[in-house]
């Protein structure tokens, strides 16, 4: 986010006590979505999540587990959402979730705090530095 922007849009953290974050988020009125291959399929749930998120005071907190996620997260998240019910990478789960939440419009978001931006090319690459 330092280079490509999005600080006002996203917050990414590695934390020592993720359970504390989830508890606090929910206590403050936030919605927690846990991405897991064991959850309800995203296409069956995305409309409900989108509608529900509008009734909460905080933005969505997305929890993405790895191989050995504690059962606690399955019971303390508002939604357990499956991005397919086969093993997959955490990054791909987040990408698909964001695509569904933003209905594909995330491809056209331009962050005002970006230090660089890309001009799409059929061949080669073109990156332009901003004055930020």
Swiss-Prot record:
<dbReference type="InterPro" id="IPR029028">
    <property type="entry name" value="Alpha/beta_knot_MTases"/>
</dbReference>
<protein>
    <recommendedName>
        <fullName>tRNA (cytidine(56)-2'-O)-methyltransferase</fullName>
        <ecNumber>2.1.1.206</ecNumber>
    </recommendedName>
</protein>
<dbReference type="GO" id="GO:0002128">
    <property type="term" value="P:tRNA nucleoside ribose methylation"/>
</dbReference>
<keyword id="KW-0949">S-adenosyl-L-methionine</keyword>
<comment type="function">
    <text>Specifically catalyzes the AdoMet-dependent 2'-O-ribose methylation of cytidine at position 56 in tRNAs.</text>
</comment>
<dbReference type="InterPro" id="IPR029026">
    <property type="entry name" value="tRNA_m1G_MTases_N"/>
</dbReference>
<feature type="binding site">
    <location>
        <position position="35"/>
    </location>
    <ligand>
        <name>S-adenosyl-L-methionine</name>
    </ligand>
</feature>
<keyword id="KW-0489">Methyltransferase</keyword>
<dbReference type="GO" id="GO:0005737">
    <property type="term" value="C:cytoplasm"/>
</dbReference>
<feature type="binding site">
    <location>
        <begin position="65"/>
        <end position="69"/>
    </location>
    <ligand>
        <name>S-adenosyl-L-methionine</name>
    </ligand>
</feature>
<comment type="similarity">
    <text>Belongs to the aTrm56 family.</text>
</comment>
<dbReference type="InterPro" id="IPR002845">
    <property type="entry name" value="tRNA_mtfrase_aTrm56"/>
</dbReference>
<keyword id="KW-0808">Transferase</keyword>
<dbReference type="Pfam" id="PF01994">
    <property type="entry name" value="Trm56"/>
</dbReference>
<comment type="subunit">
    <text>Homodimer.</text>
</comment>
<keyword id="KW-0819">tRNA processing</keyword>
<dbReference type="GO" id="GO:0106059">
    <property type="term" value="F:tRNA (cytidine(56)-2'-O)-methyltransferase activity"/>
</dbReference>
<keyword id="KW-0963">Cytoplasm</keyword>
<feature type="binding site">
    <location>
        <begin position="83"/>
        <end position="90"/>
    </location>
    <ligand>
        <name>S-adenosyl-L-methionine</name>
    </ligand>
</feature>
